[in-house]
Each structure stands twice: as structure tokens, then as C-alpha cells.
Amino acid sequence: MRERGWDVITVDINPDFEPDICTDITTFHYSGPVPDLIWASPPCIEFSKASLPASWACNRMPAEPDINLMLAAKRIIDDVKPRWWVIENVRGAVSWFIPILGPVRKKSGSRYLWGEFPIFDCDPGYGKWRLPPSRDRAAIRSMIPRQLSKALSIAVESSEER
């Protein structure tokens, strides 16, 4: 989106990602001009594991994933009232997000999008990343694929021209 000339403000609790605003969104209250778009991607690890069979050792976790970050993102969206908004996550989040966010609006590769945004086409050519274990694997996998953000930004720009 930055490549297309958008002003982008990033918010994250992890300073390693070098966000513009480093904070916990569960206590964050935005003040500033109303953005055209808010994109939230709560961590998907619990939801990714939730979609695996219970017998898998890596799936030994609480029965219910924590949806507090999604709820915080939705609270911010409701408070700020941008024209467009997206909350993105994985297939394992669907049953937890639908009661609050409504039906999935778009699926692109392994990513599921809820929100209010113009529908767009996007080649999910990025697929599931097969990355070896590493210290920054989770950070790399959490990045929004360039094709996806570009397709959405073009759709928003096109709808603004109408």
C-alpha cells in the first residue's frame, strides 16, 4: 500500500516489527484523522492449531482460542468508523469470528477476510509458505502478501473514483 502512495500507520505490540505505534491494542484508543481503511490481522497461531486434529501434539492447548485481539480490533473499527475495514485470519478462526464479524467476505489462499471492503480478485499465488524452523518464521508468515494488499488497495482506489 505504501508503494501505491498510501499513508500507512502500523500498530503492533512487538517492537521487533518496528511499528509506528507500539502498543497493546486491547487498551489502545486511536485519535487522529479517520483512515480510509483499517486492516487488522490478529495472530493466527491459536486458530491455525485449532483446525488441526486434537490428537496432534502441537494442538495441546486450551479448548477455546483467545479472541480478545479480534474483539479489540473490532472495537477500534467501531470507534473510528473507517469507510473500509478488514480483519484477516486463517480457516481455523472462521467458527470463532463469524458470530461477531458475520460471514467471510473473501478467501484468498490460506487467508480469510471479514469486513467492509470492495470485492477484488487476487491470485493466491503465495499459497502456504513452506519455511524451515527459524527464529523469525512466525514474523515472516504473518506478513500480508504483497499481491493481497495490492489487490485490495486497487479495489479501494477504484471504488473511490466512482
Can you describe what each PLM-predicted range is?
Residues 1-30, 36-39:
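SAM cofactor-binding core of SAM-dependent methyltransferases
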Residues 12, 26-37, 44-162:
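Class I S-adenosyl-L-methionine
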